[in-house]
Amino acid sequence: KRLPGESGVSVNQVIPEGASLKYLKDLPRAWFNAVPYREVGLMTATFSEKEYGMPYISITPMGISNTADFIEQIGKLVNVWASVLSERKLNYRLYVENQTKFV
């Protein structure tokens, strides 16, 4: 939740954290799925992609390189929607550079 939130992305649901049937109905409202650990959630993400056309990211954000890739993939997917809804794209590269500059 923290990593996408810091880059300006609202998190719809974190599954299985605190999940219940009440909240599962909101899953199709997401713009994409993030699967930071393939052991948990990959089957749900592939189902959502097949059933709802919802893309997913399956990169474990550990280490500088993978974390940067994870954020950049989020940026690409968010920009698809941002350009449709507001005709404005967001630059996530600057966020990645700021987060990794002094490491």
From Swiss-Prot:
UniProt cross-references to SUPFAM superfamilies, sorted A to Z: Helical backbone' metal receptor
Cofactor-binding details, from the entry: Binds 1 [4Fe-4S] cluster per heterodimer. The cluster is bound at the heterodimer interface by residues from both subunits.
GO biological process: light-independent chlorophyll biosynthetic process; photosynthesis
The protein's Enzyme Commission number: 1.3.7.7
Plastid recorded as keyword: yes
Primary gene name: chlB
Family per record: Belongs to the ChlB/BchB/BchZ family.
GO CC terms: chloroplast
Highest taxon, organism lineage: Eukaryota
PANTHER family: LIGHT-INDEPENDENT PROTOCHLOROPHYLLIDE REDUCTASE SUBUNIT B
Lineage: Eukaryota, Viridiplantae, Streptophyta, Embryophyta, Tracheophyta
Function text: Component of the dark-operative protochlorophyllide reductase (DPOR) that uses Mg-ATP and reduced ferredoxin to reduce ring D of protochlorophyllide (Pchlide) to form chlorophyllide a (Chlide). This reaction is light-independent. The NB-protein (ChlN-ChlB) is the catalytic component of the complex.
Places the protein is found: Plastid, Chloroplast
Organism: Claytosmunda claytoniana
Protein name, UniProt field: Light-independent protochlorophyllide reductase subunit B
Pfam families: Oxidored_nitro
Cofactor: [4Fe-4S] cluster
Catalytic activity: chlorophyllide a + oxidized 2[4Fe-4S]-[ferredoxin] + 2 ADP + 2 phosphate = protochlorophyllide a + reduced 2[4Fe-4S]-[ferredoxin] + 2 ATP + 2 H2O
Location (main, coarse): plastid
